[in-house]
Amino acid sequence: MVELNNCSNSEENGCVDSLEVRFTDFCKNGLSMGESFVTEATKLFNDSKHLLLSNNSTIGVITEGVERYWFVFVLYSVKRLSEKEVGNSSNGNEGNAFSLCQILRGAKLNVVDFFKELPQFILKVGPTLSNLYGSDWEKRLEAKELQTNFVHLSLLSKYYKRAYQELFLASGNNEDKPSATSSSAIHLPQYYRFGWLLFLSLRIHVFSRFKDLVTCTNGLVSVLAILIIHVPVRFRNFNINDSSRFVKKGDKVDLLASLGKIYQTSIDDLRETMDKVNYLITEKLKKKPCLASEFRTENLDNLDTDGLTYFEDLMEESCLPSSVSILEKDYSDAIQNKGELDERIFVNEEDSLLGSGSLSGGVVNMNGVKRKFDAMASPAKTVTSTLSPYRSPNCANSKMTVATPVSTAMTTARWLRTVIAPLQPKPSAELERFLSSCDRDVTADVIRRAQIILEAIFPSSGPAEHCAAGGSLQSTSLMDNIWAEQRTSEALKLYYRVLQTMCTAESQILNGNNLTSLLTNERFHRCMLACSAELVLATHKTVTMLFPAVLERTGITAFDLSKVIESFIRHEESLPRELRRHLNSLEERLLESMVWEKGSSMYNSLAVAKPSLAAEINRTGLLAEPMPSLDAIAMHINLSSGSLPPLPSLHKNNLAPNGQIGDIRSPKKVCSEYRSVLVERNSFTSPVKDRFLALNNIKSKFPPPALQSAFASPTRPNPGGGGETCAETAINVFFGKIVKLAAVRINGMIERLQLSQQIRETVYCLFQKILSQRTSLFFNRHIDQIILCSFYGVAKRTGADHVDIITFYNEMFIPSVKPLLVELAPAGNAEKNNHNDGQGPASPKPSPFPKLPDMSPKKVSAVHNVYVSPLRASKMDALISHSSKSYYACVGESTHAYQSPSKDLDVINNRLNGNRKLRGALNFDVDAGLVSDSIVANSLYLQNGNCRSPVAHVKTEQPES
């Protein structure tokens, strides 16, 4: 710990120099880095260390933990952003061949902590990185992509482990073969590890850029098929003749159809991926493929072998270690110079590098881990949401009945596969009728536009991009093209489908088929295409194209997209709940911050609707640039040869008035950018946030205005009459949405703080007046900042007690509590001493925070048929047994495809009220009609593995943070 407040100027310089000494020592001695790399890393460290030192202003100390985090962030940034071509280790890069995991081990930090704090480092050091590495540093750093990839791999590793344990035993079950039991300690880890390494090899050599969750799940299921075919039968944990679980083809089992049924994968996709896995085994492991139909072995008994490939000796005990070693070396060589995460840590159960945190639906939830950069934290919200535990009826009879984030994604992908994929990739006859009924036939324009825009969103690979396997494997370019073509087709069909429904609805509103002003509007069609593409990306949960990529590649702004989201949801009735939630989350994110950013087209409409604001809007340069033409986008696609970068300067402000990088320095950046990693690909939220429910309830009462006025020229009179211009109408609708969103958040704050109804109404009225009369306060800000300031201002004005938090903090709290805060700082040293001398960090210290029971202290009435409980998804599977599952409905889950949980409540009511055979006499006395707290608490504590009586500790359910 360095106490800078006790240093004089000369001493402070010594303290600063000691930081550099420790950093250099960490690089050279801790990680054995090369001299050139250390020089470059030291340059970034020296240019950014003033930001680290500035955080001591309140407490006056820098903990060793914060220092080590800064070391790691600097090294990771330099590794990713270095302009040097990193090739073979023989080219002078002997000291630079290290991965992110090696850096973390050297600093004795874990991955979860790293990702939790990384956004704060980027927020602070962004301008420095831009000066050193150019304006495209953020794209090259790929921090969001790396974090999303980590989330996906965490989910996939758990999915794989659960599936493996369901399919295979820890030891052989044939007692006639004693060697099975004696070697079980070798077989299970080796088979399990072999499968994961084979999957990682598939990701490296086949999946390339597009490592989306659905494609990777297909790869894992293909690996499971390889294991089923080759792992000795004595290790199986299933009966191949189990007709309720496996699909029969004649008198034998169709393996791929069975796996497709159990894991909700497309059989065609599974078959294609299986071919790639087989080719990978042939090329990398040098195994000779044989037609399974021509091979006789116990593993293939009762299997339909048509189309299956068998590799002799692939899983034999004598050959397996060699195969594992080959895959290990191949993976090590592939990631050696990339500075990426070593994805083998997910099957190293003894490896504590993953940390004590847990992943729930893409959100890093820390269990008792204190933020190291509290002093650096931004006012952005921490968003937590769990993935919808949707259960497919197709899996009701299988052992995979417990829904997971992965199975939820596969269920939503099934909607694309079964509802959208069968459609024609061209306008239907009904849609063509609308297109041809315009003042001129716009069918050809619509088709051409869709082709160009979707190619910009889903670019094909250039011919020069090939796999790093020396050409032995199928080129990565071809695989990328196949993926892009499939996603383009899905988005195109969805676009035509929703466009037709919208045209039908608009024609009914306008009492005519002539929709010229709408169907000839370029911005409207691009918004529809962007919305369709975003849903396809969200369904597959891609890593490389996170929102707002669709905005950048289509040339539209957040304000444009916000106009169509509600209509899109209304006009696609088959849209799964998970995708509806995704669009709701996007709309909220657009309204709360992105629409107010510099370069938003909202300012163009606002300048017309409110001329008094035009001067301020022009002075601050908030107006949007002209939307790039289709020809410009098409030319950009052709010039880029498939590797399409974002169109230059469409939405991102390059320099703020103070000369800093405005896009990074904005106080809302963490919320709008890094929140995307946790939200937009994690759109399968469950339960639905209260604000979404309330906002949707408000929306449902007011039908949306005709889309023609929403996308008309701002200065054009509104065709609906009323004397308004289209800009005034659009701004009024937009302001209405802002007010409704603010009302939901104000109400939530009031409930949490237990404030009066009068305060709620006063804050709400103040917010409305600020929006209408002081609109410029919202410019380039997050609406939560206005809401919080409104709360504080109202509290000051109404004379509430103890509200001057700023004065209290500066003048009373810190002078009194500073010694106590300083005492907390040595935790960094204690943490260091807690580590062993081994490679990874030691086990985390138990949290002093008490474990709160997941229950409400209220009595549970036996009179009511359905008890609505704030049951956490994390406790659902443990609490609900297979025998009682049919009597529960969990928010965000349904037992019927694409249906709401409310319908499940009706089903449960009917089941409870139906004719049932009572096995014994029931006591309906009043006293017996209530289930006591102790009974409920004991049941919960037993599930948690805690047998202590919790009666004295029953507390109200706390929301997950």
Swiss-Prot record:
Segments for region (Disordered): 829-856
Molecular function (GO) terms for this protein are: RNA polymerase II transcription regulatory region sequence-specific DNA binding
Using the UniProt annotation, give all residue ranges assigned to the region (Domain A).
404-606
Q: Where is this region: Pocket?
A: 404-819
**Pfam families in the record, alphabetically?**
DUF3452 (PF11934), RB_A (PF01858), RB_B (PF01857)
InterPro entries given for it? Cyclin-like_sf, RB_A, RB_B, RB_fam, RB_N
Q: Where in the cell is it found?
A: Nucleus
Region Domain B, residue ranges: 729-819
Q: Which SMART domains match?
A: DUF3452, RB_A
**What UniProt keywords are attached to this protein's entry?**
Cell cycle, Nucleus, Repressor, Transcription, Transcription regulation
Biological processes, Gene Ontology terms: cell differentiation; negative regulation of G1/S transition of mitotic cell cycle; regulation of transcription by RNA polymerase II
Top-rank taxon: Eukaryota
Q: Which GO terms describe its cellular component?
A: chromatin; nucleus; transcription regulator complex
Q: Where is this region: Spacer?
A: 607-728
**What intrachain disulfides are recorded?**
none
Q: Tell me, what does this protein do in biology?
A: Regulator of biological processes that recruits a histone deacetylase to control gene transcription. May play a role in the entry into mitosis, negatively regulating the cell proliferation. Formation of stable complexes with geminiviridae replication-associated proteins may create a cellular environment which favors viral DNA replication.
Q: What does the sequence similarity comment in the record state about its family?
A: Belongs to the retinoblastoma protein (RB) family.
State the name under which the record lists this protein.
Retinoblastoma-related protein 1
Specify the species: Nicotiana tabacum (Common tobacco)
Query: Which lineage ranks, top first, belong to the organism behind this chain?
Result: Eukaryota, Viridiplantae, Streptophyta, Embryophyta, Tracheophyta
